[in-house]
A protein has these predicted regions:
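A sequence-level detector of short, solvent-exposed, charge-rich linear segments
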Residues: 27-38, 42, 46-50, 67, ...
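C-terminal helical "tail/cap" subdomain of flavin- and related membrane-associated enzymes
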Residues: 158, 173-276
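Hydrophobic transmembrane alpha-helix bundles
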Residues: 18-26, 79-84, 102, 116-127, ...
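Conserved mid-domain beta->alpha element of the FAD-binding
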Residues: 18-19, 126-207
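Well-ordered, non-transmembrane segments within structured domains
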Residues: 72, 133-142, 267-270, 276
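Conserved FAD-binding catalytic core of PHBH/FMO-like flavoproteins
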Residues: 1-126, 130, 135
Length: 276
């Protein structure tokens, strides 16, 4: 591997390269085009996100389905909240004053029981495009792609970090087996094992996105179908269990103890929802 640092050219000889350099990194771009198949879906909307100096007014995430578009309330710390609005894909942050953001946020997030997010000073705001992306296979020779270098999910399902951690766990097991026993078994299985999990997350994230967002070409039929989906989800134990399992994340197919890590923790799942 050759690179320049401080104006000087350097060379590093290594057994493997872990491509954990993100969606815009050089690792995936270094793979010959014919060796990769790219699957991609770009959504016709984006998320306008804000960081706010205000204590969370709820200890749960709140997903809001509203006739004006999706909104999300989340927590960053005891003193900072993070909120999102669905906006057009070509929207620019410069078009949104702080007052306009709060007007729209309160319109979409104020619940029937009177709950609403605490208004505070906006300390950061940005617009993030929505896409689903997978590059396969996730291995080319001795280069292994991991995390956003190999896949992007729409953030509605909150799966991006989970997938990256699962990739690295699988890769760690492969490296451990190679250096301890000289076997390539887990490295050879890396791409197939990870992609199975990636496509499950893509399916869930696409469903969450489709269920909660307004699409430009939505008909009255589509809107009523979305409401029926949410009605079923919030009134069926089976549906809520399925959502919780997928949202929290299915157990990794890689045993944690196999790479010297603590056993995978378990936790309860709770979800708040507001339908406007």
């Amino acid at each position: 591997m050759r690179f320049r640092l401080g104006g000087d050219e350097h060379q590093v000889r290594c057994d493997f390269i872990a491509g954990c350099d993100g969606f815009h990194g050089i690792c995936r771009a270094s793979v010959p085009g014919a060796a990769l198949t790219v699957y991609e879906r770009t959504y016709p909307f984006a998320w306008l996100g804000i960081l706010v100096e205000a204590p969370p007014s709820c200890d749960e995430l709140v997903y809001a389905y509203h006739e004006r578009g999706f909104a999300l309330f989340s927590m960053r710390s005891p003193a900072v909240t993070r909120l999102y609005l669905q906006v057009p894909a070509d929207d620019a942050i410069e078009r949104w004053s702080d007052d306009a953001i709060w007007d729209e946020m309160l319109t979409r997030l104020t619940a029937l029981d009177g709950w609403k997010p605490t208004v505070g000073r906006i300390i950061q705001k940005n617009v993030t495009p929505m896409r689903g992306f997978v590059a396969a296979p996730m291995r080319h020779g001795r280069l292994f792609l991991a995390g956003d270098a190999a896949h992007i999910v729409p953030p509605t399902g909150a799966k991006g970090l989970n997938l990256a951690a699962s990739d690295v766990l699988a890769l760690a097991r492969g490296f451990k087996a190679f250096y301890e026993s000289g076997t390539n078994e887990w490295l050879d299985r890396y791409s197939d094992l990870c992609l199975r999990r990636v496509w499950r997350a893509q399916r869930f994230s696409a469903w969450m996105t489709s269920a909660l967002h307004r699409f430009p070409d939505d008909s009255a039929f589509d809107r009523r179908r979305q409401v029926a989906d949410l009605d079923y989800l919030t009134n069926s134990d089976a549906a809520m269990t399925s959502l919780a399992e997928q949202y929290v994340g299915s157990p990794s197919e890689i045993a944690f103890e196999s790479v010297g890590l603590p056993e995978q923790p378990t936790g309860k799942f709770r979800l708040g929802a507001s339908v406007g």
